[in-house]
């Protein structure tokens, strides 16, 4: 006689779990879809011209300039539209460093740590391959490099730090701005031990968001230089790093 009550209780539990799952999914989608969009300057940087060929695929965007030897695989920051980094990455390509900008699941690099492997399958062979990224993207790029150091000639971190220990013979470039209000400086300092071969460049007046072109970011400091100046300084630091 108690069988129907047990079945009814089981149905209620099942329905409760289903409702919870739907609510959690809705919250997750709301979180991931509330992201920073590439602005007009970034969109304009996606055009192909005599200086760089820009092509898009399921995995990301390729910036192919006159260089043929060096490639940077770039992971975008969390909840940032990947094409927001087009101005900086295009500038690098025009100056000899081709760049593959990875398209991340839900715009969160934590869900695409191994995307570099797919990028390497898609592009031509290069003599030197580097991996890097901005903020969360930089941290996840460093994680990939820690697991596959033999694939990389260096790591480039923009307002980011490595939570994994990197080999002593793997050079790392760290670039951040003095006005960055998002980068956790305490965590940054704590994790310096993970990057024994470190070159650090501090951009005076630069902030967190101006590595890309997506407007102001919550919690960030106010930049004292314009984005173009920060891109120039960043490109200069990266290209100098490659020479050494």
Model-predicted segments: where are they?
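Short beta-strand/loop motif that positions the catalytic acidic residue
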Residues: 174-176
């Amino acid at each position: 006689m108690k069988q129907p009550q047990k079945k009814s209780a089981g149905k209620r539990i099942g329905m409760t779990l289903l409702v919870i799952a739907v609510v959690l999914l809705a919250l997750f989608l709301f979180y991931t879809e509330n992201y920073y969009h590439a602005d007009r300057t970034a969109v304009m940087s996606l055009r192909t011209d005599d200086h760089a060929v820009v092509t898009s695929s399921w995995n990301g965007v390729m910036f192919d300039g006159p260089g043929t030897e060096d490639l940077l695989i770039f992971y975008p920051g969390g909840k940032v539209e990947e094409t927001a980094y087009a101005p900086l990455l295009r500038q690098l390509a025009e100056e000899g460093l081709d760049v593959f900008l990875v398209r991340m699941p839900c715009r969160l690099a934590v869900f695409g740590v191994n995307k570099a492997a797919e990028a390497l399958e898609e592009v031509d062979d290069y003599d030197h391959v580097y991996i890097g990224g901005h903020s969360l993207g930089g941290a996840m790029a460093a994680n990939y490099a820690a697991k596959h150091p033999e694939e990389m000639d260096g790591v480039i971190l923009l307002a980011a730090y490595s939570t994994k220990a990197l080999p002593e013979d793997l050079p790392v470039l760290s670039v951040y701005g003095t006005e960055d209000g998002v980068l956790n400086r305490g965590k940054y300092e704590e994790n310096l031990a993970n990057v024994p071969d470190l070159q650090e460049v501090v951009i005076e007046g630069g902030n967190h968001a101006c590595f890309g072109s997506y407007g102001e970011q919550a919690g960030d400091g106010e930049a004292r230089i314009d984005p173009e100046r920060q891109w120039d300084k960043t490109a200069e630091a990266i290209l100098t790093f490659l020479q050494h």
